[in-house]
Amino acid sequence: MNVKKITSEQDLHTAFEIRKAVFVEEQGCPISDEFDEFDTLHGDCQHILAYHQNVPVGTARVRIVGHTGKLERICILKSYRKFGLGKVIVDALERIVKEQGISAFKLHGQTQAAGFYEKLGYRTASEEFMLDGIPHVLMTKQDDSAL
């Protein structure tokens, strides 16, 4: 398993296909809500692809909001879950943020995945709320050891 930063339009398109498969087709999110102004190669987000045996099976993005790294659109194709790739993705996103001298992180995690994020040091920081018909919570993490 490995992760790489997306640097080509082809890889960005691959990431979009993974997001479409997970969020739109599997979870029923409206496609109009899945893609936004941050989905560009040279914008404010850094996108990544996660690979299992050289096959792209997961993706995510991260952007800096204020003095916090906001982890977004974390997803893995269904048949590749439960192999530790989620931790690999989150670790990679956190490294990207730390490279910019920032040690605070946040994400809107699906409530059913909150336990996973808690194991990685995140804490629930909000009441449950709905995004695209799916329950979410705000989760935050401070990692001062990174600086």
From Swiss-Prot:
Q: Which PROSITE patterns match?
A: GNAT
Under Enzyme Commission nomenclature, its number is: 2.3.1.-
Where is the N-acetyltransferase domain positioned along the sequence? 1-144
Q: Which InterPro entries match?
A: Acyl_CoA_acyltransferase, GNAT_dom, GNPNAT1-like
Q: Which molecular-function annotation in GO is an example for this chain?
A: N-acetyltransferase activity
| Family note | Belongs to the UPF0039 (ElaA) family.
> What function does the entry list?
Could catalyze the transfer of an acetyl group from acetyl coenzyme A (AcCoA) to an acceptor substrate and release both CoA and the acetylated product.
The protein depicted here goes by the name Putative acetyltransferase BSU40680
Q: Which organism was this protein described from? A: Bacillus subtilis (strain 168)
Recall the taxonomic lineage recorded for the source organism.
Answer: Bacteria, Bacillati, Bacillota, Bacilli, Bacillales
Which gene underlies this protein?
yybD
